Amino acid sequence: MTKSWIIKQHRDSFFKKSKVLGYRSRSAFKLIELNQKFKFFKNKINLLDLGSSPGGWSQVASNFLKKSKILAVDIEPMERINNVSFLKGNFLTEDIKDKISKEFIGKIDVIISDMAAKTTGNKSLDCIRTNELCMEVINFSSETQFGWPQNDK
């Protein structure tokens, strides 16, 4: 992190608000806004948060979904959040897919993801890598659309 990036963050109103409200990331407000528009947080659902660390979106989900099953998955560690189970690993590997399947024993109702690829400094390459990650989430969600697993083969 550069000094100019840190200064920019501290001037950002969402950064400040996230710290006051105890959210781990400013992106928590994106998810709150999305839910206000699309109302996908309904009581008693199975929710999967892919690319969850540092946990801002999982925090929001936990606040809205007190009686739901929430599983957060990331290759990076994540500090504990009430009402959220955490699985460290890559959701694209068979081992982690099996663990996700066992965790939900039934269908996944909602998948959320705010993943981005590690940046290289090359904006074009970073964009391509992040788009590839998004496509992997879409492919994963189509596998689990009507329960686990979705086998059309």
Task: Name each model-derived stretch.
Residues 75-120:
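S-adenosyl-L-methionine
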Residues 1-43:
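Class I SAM-dependent methyltransferase Rossmann-like catalytic core
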Residues 43-53:
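Conserved class I S-adenosyl-L-methionine
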Residues 41, 64-65, 104, 144-147:
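A generic alpha-to-beta junction signature in SAM-dependent methyltransferases
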Residues 54-66:
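Conserved SAM-binding loop of SAM-dependent methyltransferases across substrates and taxa
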Residues 68-71:
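Short beta-strand element of Class I
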Residues 106-148:
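Mobile active-site "lid"/loop adjacent to the S-adenosyl-L-methionine
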Residues 61, 100, 137-141:
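Class I S-adenosylmethionine-dependent transferase superfamily signal
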